[in-house]
């Protein structure tokens, strides 16, 4: 497999880099690079000689970490991701990310990963089988997917499909 940059855009305010994994001449799922997307904050622009930061500025940094983590989850839910891969992708330690994520969202990272997968599954399930949906949204086991789906939506995947398919 080779990683091929497809789009690179730089500006003062943003940096977008898209990568795709190429497998035998075909382009497959998007793979996001394992480094944080730069967040613009006043603190990052301050002179590094300043020794103290206000609480509000510290929160901006932490929110930036959480924003990057959420972005990574939303863009990679279909992959085999966990707390460690999310922490690595945003460039912080596991324990730091867990603490900041919980403070900012009042949710765990695993809870957010499952939440995103279930929301995507609701869309996919209307067009594909339960097993195909499970694997497409990042579950490695269709029975576990069905259990989690039922717990989160109060519908089994088949009930959901019957109820909401047009």
UniProtKB/Swiss-Prot annotation:
Keywords: DNA-binding, Transcription, Transcription regulation
Residues that span the membrane, as ranges: none
Native organism taxonomy: Bacteria, Pseudomonadati, Pseudomonadota, Gammaproteobacteria, Alteromonadales
Gene Ontology molecular functions: DNA-binding transcription factor activity; sequence-specific DNA binding
Protein name: Uncharacterized HTH-type transcriptional regulator in cgkA 5'region
Residue ranges annotated for the HTH araC/xylS-type domain, each copy included: 67-163
Disulfide-linked positions: none
Residues of the DNA-binding region: 84-105, 130-153
Region (Disordered), start-end ranges: 28-55
Species the sequence originates in: Pseudoalteromonas carrageenovora
Compositional bias per record (Basic and acidic residues), positions renumbered to this chain: 42-55
